Regions:
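Short terminal or interdomain "cap/linker" segment that borders an active site or interface and mediates
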Residues: 2-13, 17-18, 127-168, 176-209
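N-terminal low-complexity or simple alpha-helical regulatory segments
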Residues: 2-91
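Amphipathic, soluble alpha/beta structural segments
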Residues: 37, 112-121, 198-208
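Amphipathic interaction/junction segments at domain boundaries or subunit interfaces
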Residues: 53-166, 190
């Protein structure tokens, strides 16, 4: 019988982006330590190819983020995951966006709330189209809600609190780019790992600065 952890995947390109981003933040030795702890030594010096094949399993993604917390503690692991998420956007997710017409010019004339909503919707479409991750956007009380209904970051994990910090970092950097350099508060309010139905990230549409 097929394990449920093997049913859903990121494309190789996104797996590669995650590992390259980890290396940028932690150094190669840090990445190798995480891969060894996660029993993923086959990926050492052997990152996935830069293609769209769906071969980088959700369980692998979840394992990597969990090992960050095991190696560096909950607080240290959270900080690293946020930085890795920001790097993921700059190292490749932004390129997906450009392919979909998500350029600064496309958003320049929109007022900020419309710009954020259009950008968030387009990035949700990116994940829904190219990966097995499922994202839904909602607006409530002036805030944008980014619902991850099938989440690789906490796949098969159990926790007392939200753990999808990499997604928070990625969205923070995406919003920074979309808005032309403004900083927004992004907070994960619910998490499947904590028993909730979705991993929901709440985005304040008013920038901090």
């Amino acid at each position: 019988m097929t394990s449920p952890t093997a049913l859903y995947y990121y494309p190789n390109r996104m797996g590669r982006i995650i590992l390259i981003s980890m290396e940028e933040v932690m150094g190669r030795n840090g990445v190798n330590a995480v891969l060894n702890l996660a029993s993923l030594s086959s990926l050492i010096e052997n990152y996935p190819p830069d293609n769209s094949g769906l071969n980088f399993s959700f369980s692998t993604v979840s394992n990597l983020t969990e090992m960050l917390e095991q190696l560096y503690g909950p607080h240290g692991g959270r900080g690293l995951a946020l930085r890795i998420g920001r790097a993921c956007f700059n190292y490749g997710v932004r390129q997906y966006g450009v392919q979909m017409g998500l350029t600064e010019m496309a958003f320049r004339l929109l007022p900020l709330p419309a710009k954020l909503h259009a950008g968030a919707s387009a990035f949700a479409e990116l994940f829904n189209k190219f990966t097995d991750q499922m994202v839904r956007i909602e607006e409530e009380n002036g805030k944008l809600l980014w619902h991850i209904e099938r989440c690789p970051l906490c796949w098969d994990r159990h926790s007392h609190e939200p753990v999808c910090h990499l997604a928070v970092g990625l969205l923070q950097e995406a919003l920074f780019w979309l808005s032309g350099g403004k900083v927004f508060n992004v907070e994960e309010k619910t998490c499947i790992a904590a028993g909730d139905e979705t991993c929901t990230l709440v985005i304040d549409q008013t920038p901090i600065f």
